[in-house]
């Protein structure tokens, strides 16, 4: 047994090794001739057999008082191709039969030279040329002529017998019957489409009705649909199966020895090519019989006007015309294929069959398959359009009474409109296909590296890019500002992210000014009305010494429209810059609350700026709790409650405001430019302007302008509604003289808006006189909610003088805010209680026997000191619906029984 099994294994291994070492046999000119002859012989033999079956059956039924007409006109194209094109005499006989004439008697032998295979395979001047000029009426009359159709069948059978005998003689003379690979190509050259002949017959019961124009068109549709169905169901499966195996072999997925008949691969590929060429010629000839008799009707203006799309219809008709004129025009236009065929098979390298395989698959077979698919799709679309035109009766009635000029005009209009529609539709299809392909690539790339994509989208992944300051006109600045805000609104960071990023920002280089953008997320729950902020002066970036010496400022986004701002969230881009003065970075805990900008109002005193006093702001307080959670609603509410409590105990107002920051300005700038953000820069020594009360906004909305150089602080006391002008102790060293307005007019304009009973102090008027002759400075204004009387804290930085006691009074109570009375912790998770109760239940079940009484159990536990069980009995757990509790309850029930 072991010897037999070893022998069988060795035989199998030897067979497998021999199969893997199979090489394709070489092909010569005799092989080409044999394949063409064999294909023609099989086709003729099959056609003769089918006609021999069809004719007796039709004659038998006709004798039973049934008028059955064989449609031989549609059978003749099935013999097109290299079958009857071996010689000019045979071609002439074939054409005479198509015309309904008696073929000439000629019994001479038809010879074909070995190199002439391309001529009788690719010749296109041999099929149904007389049909090109026929009329529909004459064609229909001959088609339904029963006697003439039977006569054509007899002539065709006689011609088939002559050609079969000719091929048999050629096989004998050329000694081609010894070819051993005939069975290897039979599956590819088998004419399965000839079975259509058995269906090409029509039964006529009422001659007038069955031969009408509508019935004739319906018959043509049935013929072409039956023809296409036969091709799709019986011809294409075998060819496409072998084509797929060839593609797998070309790509390396399939070895040569796994192909069918691997040693005859070149012969099979040549047979495949001859088969495809024959099918394409057959297809074109069948299309001729259907199109040429209806050409006049299909090209009529009335037919075109009732179609679905005039431009698409014209394209289809043009392609059908070319296909009928020469079914192989697409192959002949390929110069590479024609050059290969002209030299084939003498150009085949005997030592390199693999290159021949690749060329055959890529250049010849794939090209034929593509042309075949395009042609079948073209005919299917044409038949659908033809049916639509014939059944569109409503459109036919509308254009029935139109003359030729009106039809031409309507056609031109339809052609222009339909062309645009068709081209747009094709562009959309192309874009959709591109999007699908791009989506697949993006999906694969994103799934392979999702972390990389998240790092790109995350605002904390790295430092933000520095923002370049520019001096633009107000219009251009505001437009660019809105664009930048809309572009950055989707990727803004939260206040927590900004506070965490402060530790990263401390790594900036010393000395030089490196501004960094921080993308902030707008609080979508707060929607403030429109806030009018005056335009700031342009920022100078020429002097590096002034930039390094001055504190750094922050600017906010541009102003939105009043109607739009009441409905949408204000998107703001905050620019924060860091600098180290005295080797100490800016503290992250002293950042101003970003949500304060929603209730901020600022006015910059400039002779050329169009200043507008603020409109009423919302009553919602925007005080900050701490820098780490400045945007938290809970902490903000706690801070508001704390300050309300403090203000109730200490009614004395404290002059508090948000943190001012300063930025340099260009003294020589003639036109003030709106900054890229909503917040205005302040002066070097921290001059601020607090907003006026609610009642002053309308009165002060005129062209009121204030001039200051940064040495004066204009404060509004909320207690008695006074405007106070206070001189600050330090003057800016960089100020230059510029054109100014008298301050008295500005102060008077401000005073006009104050309520009755408010008056300016002499000290403030004295300080106002000193404003003349001083240069303008850029002011940073941040307003608090002055309607409720709540103060805000003014924060100073390095290089800014400290606040006086009057400006910053000491608080009466210690601590930033009081601690809450009760700490509300979240509820205990349900899983914890379930686990605890489950332990108690299991203890009750398994520690003691449940068959005893509860009293005995409790006494026993009391003696043993079982505290856990006693607690469990005193406080029975709540029954839960879970898998574990169900299991315990079932076990307990079984034990208690």
Swiss-Prot record:
Transmembrane segments: none
Region (Disordered): 444-523, 537-562, 607-632, 647-794
Listed Low complexity bias regions: 444-459, 473-490, 537-554, 657-677
Keyword GTP-binding appears in the UniProt entry: no
GO CC entries: cytoplasm
Record-level Gene Ontology MF annotations: protein phosphatase 1 binding; protein phosphatase regulator activity
Compositional bias ranges of the Basic and acidic residues kind: 495-508
Compositionally biased region (Polar residues): 678-687, 698-718, 746-764
The keyword Cytoplasm is annotated on this UniProt entry: yes
Domain of life, per lineage: Eukaryota
Annotated localization: Cytoplasm
InterPro entries, per the entry: GIP4
Keywords per UniProt: Cytoplasm
Similarity section: Belongs to the GIP4 family.
Subunit record text: Interacts with GLC7.
Stated role: GLC7 phosphatase-regulatory protein involved in GLC7 subcellular redistribution and chromosome segregation.
Protein name: GLC7-interacting protein 4
Gene name of this polypeptide: GIP4
């Amino acid at each position: 047994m072991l010897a037999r099994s070893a022998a069988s294994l060795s035989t199998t291994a030897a067979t497998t090794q021999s199969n893997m070492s199979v090489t394709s046999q070489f092909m010569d000119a005799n092989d080409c001739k044999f394949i063409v002859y064999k294909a023609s012989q099989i086709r003729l033999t099959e056609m003769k057999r089918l006609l021999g079956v069809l004719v007796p059956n039709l004659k038998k039924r006709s004798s039973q008082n049934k008028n059955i007409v064989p449609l031989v006109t549609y059978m003749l194209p099935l013999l097109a191709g290299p079958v009857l094109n071996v010689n000019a005499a045979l071609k002439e006989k074939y054409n005479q039969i198509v015309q309904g004439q008696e073929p000439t008697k000629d019994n001479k032998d038809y010879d074909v030279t070995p190199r002439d295979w391309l001529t009788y395979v690719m010749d296109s001047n041999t099929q149904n040329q007389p049909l090109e000029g026929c009329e529909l009426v004459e064609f229909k009359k001959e088609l339904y002529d029963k006697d003439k159709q039977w006569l054509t069948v007899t002539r065709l059978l006689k011609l088939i017998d002559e050609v079969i005998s000719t091929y048999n003689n050629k096989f004998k003379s050329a000694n081609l019957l010894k070819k051993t690979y005939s069975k290897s190509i039979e599956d590819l050259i088998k004419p399965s489409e000839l079975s259509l002949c058995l269906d090409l017959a029509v039964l006529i019961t009422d001659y007038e009705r069955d031969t009408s124009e509508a019935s004739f068109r319906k018959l043509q549709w049935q013929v072409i649909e039956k023809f296409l169905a036969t091709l799709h169901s019986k011809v294409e499966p075998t060819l496409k199966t072998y084509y797929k195996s060839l593609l797998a072999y070309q790509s390396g997925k399939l070895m040569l020895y796994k192909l069918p008949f691997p040693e005859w691969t070149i012969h099979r590929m040549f047979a495949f090519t001859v088969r495809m060429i024959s099918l394409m010629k057959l297809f074109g000839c069948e299309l001729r019989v259907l199109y040429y008799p209806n050409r006049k009707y299909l090209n009529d203006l009335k037919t075109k006007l009732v179609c679905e799309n005039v431009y698409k219809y014209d394209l289809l008709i043009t392609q059908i015309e070319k296909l009928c004129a020469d079914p192989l025009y697409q192959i002949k236009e390929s110069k590479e294929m024609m050059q290969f065929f002209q030299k084939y098979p003498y150009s085949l390298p005997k030592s390199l069959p693999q290159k021949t395989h690749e060329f055959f698959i890529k250049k010849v077979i794939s090209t034929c398959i593509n042309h075949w698919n395009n042609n079948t799709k073209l005919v299917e679309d044409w038949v659908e359009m033809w049916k639509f035109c014939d059944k569109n009766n409503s459109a036919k009635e509308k254009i029935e009474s139109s003359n030729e000029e009106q039809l031409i005009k309507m056609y031109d209009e339809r052609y222009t409109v339909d062309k645009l529609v068709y081209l747009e539709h094709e562009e959309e299809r192309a874009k959709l296909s591109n999007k699908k392909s791009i989506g697949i690539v993006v999906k694969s790339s994103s799934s392979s590296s999702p972390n990389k994509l998240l790092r790109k989208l995350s605002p904390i992944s790295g430092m933000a890019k520095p923002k370049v300051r520019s001096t633009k006109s107000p219009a251009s600045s505001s437009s660019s500002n809105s664009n930048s805000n809309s572009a950055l609104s989707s990727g803004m960071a939260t206040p927590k992210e900004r506070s965490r990023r402060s530790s990263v920002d401390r790594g900036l280089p010393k000395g030089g000014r490196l501004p960094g953008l921080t993308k902030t997320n707008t609080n979508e729950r707060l929607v403030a009305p429109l806030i009018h902020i005056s335009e700031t002066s342009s920022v100078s970036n020429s002097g590096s010494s002034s930039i390094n010496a001055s504190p750094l400022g922050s600017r906010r986004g541009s102003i939105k429209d009043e109607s739009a701002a009441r409905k949408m969230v204000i998107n703001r881009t905050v620019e924060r810059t860091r600098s180290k003065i005295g080797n100490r970075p800016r503290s992250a805990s002293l950042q101003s609350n970003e949500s304060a900008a929603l209730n901020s109002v600022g006015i910059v005193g400039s002779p050329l700026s169009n200043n507008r006093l603020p409109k009423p702001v919302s009553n919602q307080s925007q005080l900050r709790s701490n820098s780490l959670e400045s945007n938290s609603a809970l902490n903000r509410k706690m801070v508001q409650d704390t300050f309300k409590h403090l203000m109730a105990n200490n009614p004395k107002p404290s002059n508090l405001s948000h943190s001012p920051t300063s930025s340099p300005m260009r003294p020589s700038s003639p036109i003030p430019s709106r900054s890229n953000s909503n917040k205005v820069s302040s002066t070097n020594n921290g001059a601020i302007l607090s907003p006026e009360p609610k009642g002053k906004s309308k009165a002060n909305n005129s062209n009121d302008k204030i001039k200051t150089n940064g040495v004066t602080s204009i404060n509004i006391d909320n207690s008695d509604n006074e405007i106070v002008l206070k001189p600050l102790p330090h003057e800016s060293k960089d100020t230059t003289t510029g054109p100014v307005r008298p301050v008295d007019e500005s102060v008077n304009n401000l005073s006009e808006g104050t309520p009755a009973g408010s008056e300016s102090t002499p000290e403030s008027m004295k300080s106002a006189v000193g404003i003349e002759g001083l240069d303008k400075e850029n002011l940073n204004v941040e307003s608090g909610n002055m309607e409720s009387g709540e103060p805000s804290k003014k924060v100073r930085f390095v290089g800014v003088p400290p606040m006086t006691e009057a400006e910053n009074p000491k608080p009466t109570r210690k601590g930033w805010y009081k601690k809450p009375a009760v700490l509300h912790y979240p509820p205990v998770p349900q899983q914890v209680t379930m686990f605890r109760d489950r332990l108690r239940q299991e203890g009750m079940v398994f520690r003691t026997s449940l068959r005893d009484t509860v009293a005995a159990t409790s006494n026993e536990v009391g003696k043993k000191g079982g505290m856990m069980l006693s607690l469990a009995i005193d406080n029975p757990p709540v029954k839960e619906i879970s898998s574990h509790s169900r299991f315990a309850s079932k076990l307990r029930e079984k034990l208690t029984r």
